[in-house]
Curated annotation (Swiss-Prot):
This is tRNA pseudouridine synthase B. The lineage of its organism: Bacteria, Pseudomonadati, Chlorobiota, Chlorobiia, Chlorobiales. Belongs to the pseudouridine synthase TruB family. Type 1 subfamily. Responsible for synthesis of pseudouridine from uracil-55 in the psi GC loop of transfer RNAs. It catalyses: uridine(55) in tRNA = pseudouridine(55) in tRNA. It comes from Chloroherpeton thalassium (strain ATCC 35110 / GB-78). The gene is truB. The active site is at residue 52. Its EC number is 5.4.99.25.
């Protein structure tokens, strides 16, 4: 399955990549696109749903004719694993900004933590974080946030949480597995989870493990894909001589 998905086909393919920490989704697209061009292979390249720089895991790219199918991948449900630090908040709901509003967590019990997670299951309205790319009055929300502005009336959207499993508790860190609909901000869930427990919290680690039926176990590294592109170009050149 992995070889079929991650082959470098002339008409286009889906590339399943394990995105490294610190890379933007566009960084990955740019690296792949540049490699195609450098090796004399003309390919359109686009990603099938962004992944934050501070997250790792499954990023799907489409090339060639498969770029026409990007929208069919973007709508698929997602699965994540990660960690939340309780007893402290950040403006961005993750580690991108400074911690504030510290609070004791030693009084929290395992049953309270599991029950708080269960309360997130089902359909709900979710506000995007201020530090997000959502548009508001001609600007991205993060642009407003960096100017010190808060937009309480930012528009909520419908999301659904299918599973929110607590997989480990070592306070103040709580580890989890999450299954959600497309467009769900896991950072917002982390922040709201901390609020529900009365201590605050933010996302310290996030890894995307599934997009629909596509799994991180099928993914390859950026280096693996780049190597395949070079080999494909060499084989193509050999056929021409």
């Amino acid at each position: 399955m992995m070889d079929r998905l991650n082959c470098v086909c002339p008409d286009g393919e889906f590339l399943l990549i394990d995105k490294p920490l610190g890379w933007t989704s566009f960084d990955v697209v740019a690296r792949i696109r540049t490699s195609y061009k450098k090796n004399g292979l003309k390919r359109k390249v686009g990603h099938c749903g962004t992944l934050d720089p501070l997250a790792t895991g499954l990023l799907m790219l489409a090339t060639g004719k498969k770029t026409k199918e990007i929208s069919s991948i973007e709508i698929l449900d997602k699965e994540y694993t990660g960690a939340i630090k309780l007893g402290v908040k950040t403006p961005s709901y993750d580690g991108e900004t400074e911690e504030f509003d510290f609070c004791e967590t030693s009084h929290l019990t395992s049953s309270e933590i599991h029950e708080a997670a269960r309360q997130f299951l089902g359909k709900q309205q979710q506000k995007p974080p201020m530090f997000s790319a959502t548009w508001h009055k001609g600007k991205r929300l993060y642009e407003h946030a960096r100017q010190g502005k808060d937009i309480p009336e930012r528009k909520s959207k419908d999301v659904e949480v299918f599973a929110f499993d607590i997989t480990g508790i070592e306070l103040p860190i709580v580890r989890f597995r999450l299954q959600v609909t497309k467009g769900t901000y896991v950072r917002s869930i982390a922040n709201d989870f901390g609020e529900r427990l009365g201590v605050g919290g933010y996302l310290t680690e996030l890894r995307r493990t599934k997009i629909g039926d596509f799994s991180i176990s099928q993914a390859e590294t950026v280096s693996d894909i780049l190597e395949k592109i070079v080999k494909t170009a060499e084989a193509h050149q050999a056929n021409l001589t």
